[in-house]
Amino acid sequence: MANPVVAIVGRPNVGKSTIFNRLAGERISIVEDTPGVTRDRIYARTEWLGHPFNLIDTGGIDIGDEPFLTQITEQAEIAIEEADVIIFVVSVKEGVTDADEKVARILYRTDKPVVLAVNKVDNPELRADIYDFYSLGFGEPIPVAGTHGIGTGDLLDKIIKEFPKDATNEEDDSIKFSFIGRPNVGKSSLVNAILGENRVIVSNIEGTTRDAIDTRFETEDGTKYTMIDTAGIRKKGKVYENTEKYSVLRAMRAIDRSDVVCVVLNAEEGIREQDKHVAGYAHEAGRAIVIVVNKWDTLKKDNKTMSDFENLIRQEFQYLSYAPIVFVSAKTKQRLDKLPELIKRVNDNHEQRISSAVLNDVVMDAIAHNPTPTDNGKRLRIYYATQVAIKPPTFVIFVNDPELMHFSYERFLENQIREAFDFEGTPIHIIERRRK
């Protein structure tokens, strides 16, 4: 199951971004940013009381130079389409406005839960004014002050109560993968070419997200795959359909539901900032990753073209040094037959478990060749290591003092583990814990 999505909507100047930053910052944990991922985020991966979810500020979705009421409408429609829970933000300072009522009328169309947050209630005298907002028809308003963090705990408690229950627990042994990338990199062509080349049986199944249709197929060796649909709002002609931020949001949904993410680049156009945004999100989410360079047939090539492009990728995506790169053409089918096999291999690595005995042999051998660092005369001591999770493989190393583990030595240990075991295509996480 993908993490639930919570969208923040409301007219301008009610404090949506302040509430977004508050919920995504001090009161709840947020997965650390990877350099080069994104600058002005409209989404955050967060959690509250052990419930992970994705938070979206629809106000950050740029819909061009349209009248602001039109923008509100379209942002609310995005929330209705994408979210599991909607936070409707209003301001106690202005009371109920015509624009608030317009947003409310749009939200009446959905059967998704709407939590009404009355912002800017920064002193007790204003609390009596929140009852005016009952007229909007969304039940009890929750008073908050985004700037000061007042009421955010109550708001979060209400939100997680509204999360959908897992609809199914049935086992699915297929490998779930998706093609992500900015518009015009050739994702649709790749999907069609892969299905045309490799399918033995194909069925369309209801996706867990809105009107998405996932496609299952099986290759001749019996491996089952589910291709995750990345389609979002299917309203042709909408200005926001191809905006950068909306396509990032669409990719985020697919990444959360995938085991393996194929980051698609356009060989003709090289690497753009948005390529880094979506790849960085997949990395932060701990997914297995394959970098797919599409439209390779369109380039004039010499004997250095491929190595030069690979070097560029390694330079621009330094945090994806573990990800294999494949150069393909959806049009000519060049190397497409290799892709399902590569997806399976990185998925196997993503699920790989290493026995503690073998792992500790590697770690102790690494220490013997490169002794642990010291700080102010105190040496880091590593007692033992064990794998505690898969997808991604996660290792806990028990030490005398976690503060003594320098990031460069942790990187050294990661490299030694990667050399000893095949973890191509998957991030690995290392956690230091003090031995009790």
Curated annotation (Swiss-Prot):
InterPro entries: G_ENGA, GTP-bd, GTPase_Der, KH_dom-like, KH_dom-like_a/b, P-loop_NTPase, Small_GTP-bd. GTPase that plays an essential role in the late steps of ribosome biogenesis. Associates with the 50S ribosomal subunit. It holds the Pfam family KH_dom-like. The keyword Nucleotide-binding applies. Residues 4-167, 175-351 form the EngA-type G domain. GO terms for molecular function: GTP binding; ribosome binding. One of its GO terms (biological process) is ribosome biogenesis. It comes from the Bacteria. GTP 2 binds at residues 181-188, 229-233, 294-297. Disulfide bonds: none annotated. Belongs to the TRAFAC class TrmE-Era-EngA-EngB-Septin-like GTPase superfamily. EngA (Der) GTPase family. GTP 1 binds at residues 10-17, 57-61, 119-122. PANTHER family: GTPASE DER. This is GTPase Der. Residues 352-436 form the KH-like domain.
